[in-house]
Amino acid sequence: MIKGAVAARYAQALFDVARDNNRIAETENELRGFMRLLDESRDLQQVLYNPQVPVELKKEIVREAFGKELSGTTLNFLCLVLDRRREVYLKGIADHFIALANETRNIIEAEVTSALELSVVHKVNLMQVLSRMTGKELRIRYQVDPDIIGGLVVRLGDRIIDGSIKRQLERLKDSIRETKVG
């Protein structure tokens, strides 16, 4: 089974339990918090992702470190993932769970990259256009990347809209090469 499919199955199982218990938002917040701490802690990564560390020790560490912050459902789910030796799928599971939660709430996550910081007016206008385009509420994360030279790169879920000057120059270069060859 491919990596994405494994993560999707585990995420769907956790989502079903969270939905049945009316705890989708809480479970999502717990997963986001757990993953944020996991991303920030090299020590925790080295323990959880190391196949030489016994599963029981991993579970004990998770219970000790997160037992007070996580609900029983989320904590038990993480222990199940560890029991099944699926810890390498944790990020994918969290991402799939968040996507399922967003789909339920008619929300789409977007990432907008610009060469310069966008003004508040530009951000509001962009949000309105993207919301009309998708028919969904948006959660947009903005980032600045001077390498794109100008324009925007917008990621909406699985779709990427590359309106950057860098991409336009690449297309022009490819077009010139094809003309010379042909």
Swiss-Prot record:
User: What is the recorded name of this protein?
Assistant: ATP synthase subunit delta
Determine if Transferase is one of this entry's keywords.
Answer: no
Against InterPro entries, the record matches this protein to: ATP_synth_OSCP/delta_N_sf (IPR026015), ATPase_OSCP/d_CS (IPR020781), ATPase_OSCP/dsu (IPR000711)
As for membrane topology, the entry says: Peripheral membrane protein
**Any keyword Ion transport?**
yes
Which family does the record assign? Belongs to the ATPase delta chain family.
Its chief place of residence is: membrane
| Subcellular location(s) per record | Cell membrane
Main function:
F(1)F(0) ATP synthase produces ATP from ADP in the presence of a proton or sodium gradient. F-type ATPases consist of two structural domains, F(1) containing the extramembraneous catalytic core and F(0) containing the membrane proton channel, linked together by a central stalk and a peripheral stalk. During catalysis, ATP synthesis in the catalytic domain of F(1) is coupled via a rotary mechanism of the central stalk subunits to proton translocation.
Instruction: Please provide the record's keywords in A-Z order.
Output: ATP synthesis, Cell membrane, CF(1), Hydrogen ion transport, Ion transport, Membrane, Transport
One MF term in GO for this entry?
A: proton-transporting ATP synthase activity, rotational mechanism
Gene3D superfamilies to which the protein is assigned, alphabetical: N-terminal domain of the delta subunit of the F1F0-ATP synthase
Subunit and interaction comment: F-type ATPases have 2 components, F(1) - the catalytic core - and F(0) - the membrane proton channel. F(1) has five subunits: alpha(3), beta(3), gamma(1), delta(1), epsilon(1). F(0) has three main subunits: a(1), b(2) and c(10-14). The alpha and beta chains form an alternating ring which encloses part of the gamma chain. F(1) is attached to F(0) by a central stalk formed by the gamma and epsilon chains, while a peripheral stalk is formed by the delta and b chains.
**Origin: domain of life:** Bacteria
Checking Pfam families in the record gives: OSCP
Mind telling me which GO cellular component terms the entry cites? plasma membrane; proton-transporting ATP synthase complex
